[in-house]
Amino acid sequence: MIDNPYTEKAWNNFKIRTFSVAVNEQELVWHRDKRSRIVRVIEGEGWKIQLDNQLPRDFYEGDIINISKMRYHRLIKGNTDLVLEIKEQ
């Protein structure tokens, strides 16, 4: 079984996912998800997201990004814990 590089709490249609600043960067791998999702940054500094065939972009508190199902993407580690709100479509 593969451990996830985050902790997660789920309720209703949302997940709150927390990535620790102590996460090993090698755990933040390129991956795809089976469902489209809307991701909102609740807190975190210095983190970036990179979508397939795009340069990394900064992730700021309050940012919202749509990630289509089966699209490769990854996170790039920042300076603080990262907390995301995720709503799957």
Regions found by a protein language model. Name each.
Residues 1-19:
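Transition segment at domain starts
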